[in-house]
Amino acid sequence: MQAAKRILSLTLVLVLVLALAACGAQSSTATTAAPETTAAPETTEAATEAATEAATEAPAEVKHTVYPLTIQTYNYAKEPVEYTFEKAPERVWAQNQDNIEILLALGLADKIVGACGLDGDVREDLKADFETINYYDKMPSKEEIIALNPDFITGWYSTFSDKRLGDVDFWHERNVGTYMALNSACRGKAAENPQTVEDEYQDILTLGEIFDVQDRAEAIVNDMKAQVQQIEDYLADKTRLTAAVLEDEGGTYRVYGEDVLGGNVAIHGGAELVVGKHGNNGSISAEDLILANPDAIFMVWYDGYSVGDVDYAGDHVVKLITENPAFASLDAVKNGRVYPINLSGIYCSGMRTIDGILDVAKNLYPELYQ
């Protein structure tokens, strides 16, 4: 009987121990489950961070042009035409400052067999490459250019006049590709086809695609866009200063308004244009300017610019406004806000597009750049 009691007691103790062990196991499981639940977001966050770092460190995929490549350009009748490139051009004739500088910036100096048409000095950052190309101080004849055996010509609308190189079909029939800068009047009147900064971006991107250097072209354009965005962000909650972009034509003033690149550059630089609204691309009188009374005036100049046989190139151009007694009442004159602006930054500007934009922005909003 005593033995039976001892067996029963041992059995009860064993059951109790097992029960306590089971409770302990459940308690332990519950305790460890909670940290696992709260730790999950931390693990996900760490994984996301690691993936982001890996993506940042991974080299970006380089775009490559797929040939044959068909682009749209224009003929001298201002009609759109297409040309197909079987491969990247190897022998290029580059006409005018914008095209020369774009090709140099894209690293294509070794592809240029001849160039002509600079309006001034080449950009400082491109001078070394410029020294390596075959540059003509005077425009060669059509026959001389044919002798260079080019496979691509990039220029302005005027490049393809009969007095110069002839219409594009002459070259296309000889397997020589062509490209006209979009803002060189190749598409017709500006009132119907406004000239924009975005067109300058497109010239760079198109040339980049033709030569299979899209990564370089996109880097250039993206840098310009980032600087423009900085201006936009700054002005998001501010009133824009009013401005006029003018060229003295000897008593009247040519307006660079909303429909032409000069006006669009000024708008991108933060200006509110008070003359040259859409469809009004003519000239204004002194009286019109006094009536408009802009906060700032930008006077256009270029190398060799003169009025009445007087040299007004560079900073001298502002004297056409500041030293004219008729304009003494203008706010821009009284406040010292008449500025020079170079034509190369506001007409078929290419790489200099950002120079024109910053000329406007830095003069209107100097505090943004301090």
Predicted regions and their residues:
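Bacterial N-terminal signal peptides that target proteins for export
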Residues: 1-11
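Bacterial Sec-exported substrate-binding components of ABC uptake systems
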Residues: 12, 23-100, 209-245, 363-370
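C-terminal motif of bacterial Sec signal peptides marking the signal peptidase cleavage site
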Residues: 18-22
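Short helix-initiation/N-cap motifs at beta->coil->alpha
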Residues: 74-79, 131-143, 278-286
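A short, structured surface patch at a secondary-structure boundary
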Residues: 91-158
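Alpha-helical, coiled-coil/dimerization segments enriched in small aliphatic residues
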Residues: 118-122, 130, 255-281
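Extracytoplasmic ligand-binding site segments that recognize negatively charged/polar headgroups
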Residues: 121, 160-166, 176-206, 239-263
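Structured C-terminal subdomain patch of bacterial secreted/periplasmic proteins
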Residues: 194-204, 209, 218, 299-370
